[in-house]
């Protein structure tokens, strides 16, 4: 079974130029796809429709913010403005809970062609779906978007498994509080089925082991920033008798790399679980 988690950044870079992120995800042929920063345009590009129309993937999309996606961006070769983390990027605009920066307002003025739509997270799979549930994680005070956990129960060759999709907050915005909420949801699940928890955690693996103990990493590879990665902040975590067959990360044009893990359930451990 192939699990892929990929932050698609709505299919544009930090200047609003189109990327091939969605095509890259589809080319990886996942059995389970955890998609952060999916885009559903009001009158244009719809990533969910593309996924379900061109593949056998089915699942759940959760809108976490209204946004504007720039469609006329241009800029230098770098993926986004050099100081984008301080002045804001120029590819996506979120205004529900925070004002745009002066630099963003100026760019919005001179690059008026934008597409409005919904920005969010998705969990899609080719496996039979037993149940799907969305757990709200709220919005942290410093955040410009809401957060949610998608909880799926799937059938893998006659065995039930849980798969959870998360796009976590940054540490500076209060991610420990968010991860405590995730831990409480996990603790309330049926303890028998093996679990996979995957997504863009915005958190390094050493810290994640402290904030979310008791998980095994099913894929270890640098995922951020996408062009010259030095850190892993996207993760595929497992509980239960998962066995990693292969794993890696690949550049699909986004600011994160796509992380994949080919995994199997250990037959002996599954039988002992009854």
Regions inferred by a protein language model and the residue ranges of each:
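Glycosyltransferases and closely related glycan-assembly transferases
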Residues: 48-55
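A short beta-strand element within the Helicase C-terminal
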Residues: 37-38
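Active-site regions of metal-assisted phosphoester/phosphodiester hydrolases
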Residues: 1-32, 41-43, 58-60, 66-67, ...
């Amino acid at each position: 079974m192939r699990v892929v988690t990929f932050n698609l950044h709505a299919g544009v870079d930090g200047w609003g130029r189109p990327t091939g992120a969605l095509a890259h995800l589809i080319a990886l042929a996942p059995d389970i796809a955890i998609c952060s920063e999916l885009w559903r345009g009001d009158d244009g590009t719809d990533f969910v429709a593309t996924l379900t129309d061109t593949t056998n993937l089915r699942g759940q999309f959760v809108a976490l913010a209204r946004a504007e996606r720039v469609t006329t961006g241009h800029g230098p070769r770098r993926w986004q403005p050099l100081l984008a983390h301080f002045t804001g990027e120029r590819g996506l605009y979120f205004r529900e809970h925070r004002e745009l920066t002066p630099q963003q307002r100026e760019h919005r003025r001179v690059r008026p062609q934008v597409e409005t739509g919904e920005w969010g997270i998705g969990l899609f799979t080719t496996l039979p779906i037993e149940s799907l549930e969305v757990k709200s994680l709220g919005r942290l005070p410093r955040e410009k978007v809401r957060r949610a956990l998608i909880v799926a129960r799937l059938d893998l060759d006659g065995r039930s498994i849980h798969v959870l999709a998360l796009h976590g907050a940054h540490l500076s915005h209060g991610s420990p509080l968010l991860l405590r909420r995730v831990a409480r949801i996990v603790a309330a699940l049926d303890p028998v089925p093996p679990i996979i928890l995957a997504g863009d955690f915005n958190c390094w693996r050493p810290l994640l082991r402290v904030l979310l103990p008791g998980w095994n990493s099913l894929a270890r590879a640098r995922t951020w920033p996408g062009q010259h990665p030095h850190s892993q902040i996207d993760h595929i975590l497992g509980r239960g008798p998962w066995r990693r067959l292969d794993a890696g990360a690949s550049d699909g044009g986004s600011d994160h790399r796509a992380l994949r893990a080919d995994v199997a359930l250990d037959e002996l451990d599954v039988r002992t679980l009854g």
